[in-house]
Amino acid sequence: MKISREVPVNAYRAGEGFLPAYQKLVREVVIPYQYQVLNDKMEGVEKSHALENLRLAARKNRGEEVTEEFYGMVFQDSDVAKWLEAAAYTLGQHPNPELEQEVDGVISLLEEAQQKDGYLNSYFTVKEPNRKWTNLQEAHELYCAGHLMEAACAYYEATGKDSLLKIMEKNADCIYQQFMENNTRGYSGHPEVELALMRLYRATGKEKYKELCAHFLDARGQKPNYFVEENATRGWDVWGTHHDTVDTDYTQSTLPVREQKDAVGHAVRAVYLYTAMADMAGESGDEGLKNACHALWESVTHRQMYVTGGIGSTVLGEAFTVDYDLPNATVYAETCASIGLIFFARQMLQLEAKGEYTDVMERALYNTVLGGMQLDGKRFFYVNPLEVVPGISGKAATQLHDLPQRPPWYACACCPPNVARLLSSIGSYAYGEGENTLFVHLYLGGEVESSLGYSLSCETEYPRFGKAKFTFHGEKKTTLAFHIPAWSQKTTLSVNGEEWDLAECAKDGYAYVDRSFQEGDVVELSFDMTPYKVYATSRVPADTGCVAVQRGPMVYCAEGVDNEGDVLSLSVAEEGTIREEPYNAQLLGGIVPLTVEGWRVRPTQELYSRKRPEQEPVEIRLVPYYTWGNRGENQMRVWLPET
């Protein structure tokens, strides 16, 4: 069973610091920008049509003649849902009448687009009204429903308004009737509804939604495989090309969920499924699910994860491949996949308080997720490469997906609103509550109101710097549990100036401060931010003979703009010293640049030569990976040869 739960998103109030600044960016720039994009009001940006699709569905429901066509991906509704969820979290912490009016307008539109029986999906209402529930493999009906359920729960939890919750309860009841009462076989080709049903269950207290989630989990991967049978009989395809065989790895349906041990197939689908499995394991005490989650966690994070917290090695199926296949230039590492990995990590933390889950959460958040958005909040990466060479990246047939710069939007725009909803709800990832214990997973400035009868405020510039100061408000005999990152070689913790022995109070990556707290008590932590070299196991062929550099949870990279335009000729000296430069508030939003001693070889004109290249000593300048691509198109590398 669960040993903790996330705090409600409204329990955290942002203060000053690194992540609160990102929350402000999402609130002031990202959410308004994305609303304009969803309304097709942004010039020079890929057309969305997502809200217009819902307007067309509403008109059809009113019996009006609709000559316009549905536009976009079959899952276009989910872009609206994720934007709604991000807006909901923002409204809960920062009331904004204009934004609330926009949100309520979208909710009214969803109500008009919903059919009398609760069915809600603009693609099928507008384009394929006679083919509902006939293509679960491809058509994302349940996926879109899941995202809208999450938005509904978020809006209810953040504002207390239940208008969207009522709409999505009606939709969930429609799905329940279809799959439980009418005994329709099947489950979603793209997992998402499962984790959403667990949220809906907790928001409403209705057991039927948990029951429906369990049904979908239990049905997945059973023989005969549902997708194989559906594919043979349905007679139509979303993407226009019919395949006689079904990639069951891609749809996460090769094996029943309790028998899964290796992460395979589409990376986002995988971690969304694992999130639901871990959630259900915690709610029901299902040891089979819990054991599967442990095996899958190890498969992902010990053998198939990039140093940046990216997952999914290939563009072919946006998928995992095999253990230790982690190419840097042809990588996929979708932003949504790292977000899903954070979802999975949070659920695993609720099963057991182990620092390795939080370490991965940090790795994914501070590198790939933040790197998935331009510093101005208006451009986004779908794919997150670890090596970029303009002229090859985004151009060569094998690297069309690895772009050297972030576009302002995508035809398939799942990632931009996903980043927004994660960052706007980050407080519920930062803190968890157990029995008389408040867990501090992530360090961010602000204050959290605990249901245990006290509040805790935090002052920190983490992860730029390695100090965090917590002040206790109230009087309570309780336990505060602080994450101790594995990368910190020397961590100190003091209470009211008196240092505690971590050997006595720390376990599995958490330091437990158990005492009778008084108003104004101060807990201070200091982490060792000394930058260091990282080496991959020799099982990873792409990184053989190479080194990466990390400071705190942030991986660094070399960009051409800092290194004479060429990082391909650089290598790090084996005994080279890494040096921290002073914090530069004016550079890339405020960073601590690094330099490392190394070498540069001078390129020759010949493609191949007997002559050994000449080399000269250089200082290689490094910046945090999440900041790359913000200064124009240029080369970038995370892993550099070591000589």
Regions inferred by a protein language model and the residue ranges of each:
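Catalytic-core region of carbohydrate-active enzymes that cleave or remodel glycosidic bonds
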Residues: G282-R303, N328-K378
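Well-ordered alpha-helical scaffold segments within catalytic/enzyme domains
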Residues: L19, L84-P97, G146-K161, E194-K206, ...
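Solvent-exposed beta-strand/loop surfaces of large extracellular or lumenal domains
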Residues: S488-D514, K533-R539
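C-terminal beta-rich recognition modules with glycine/proline-rich loops and embedded aromatic residues
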Residues: A11, C213, C293, D359-N367, ...
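Extended ligand-binding groove/face enriched in aromatic
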Residues: L56-F75, A81, E85, T90-S188, ...
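Solvent-exposed loop and edge beta-strand segments that line ligand/cofactor-binding
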Residues: K2-S4, A58-V80, R131-C144, Q177-H190, ...
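Low-complexity, Ser/Thr/Pro/Gly-enriched N-terminal "stalk/linker" regions
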Residues: M1-D79, D104-F124
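Surface-exposed beta-strand/loop patches in extracellular or lumenal glycoproteins
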Residues: T471, K476-P485
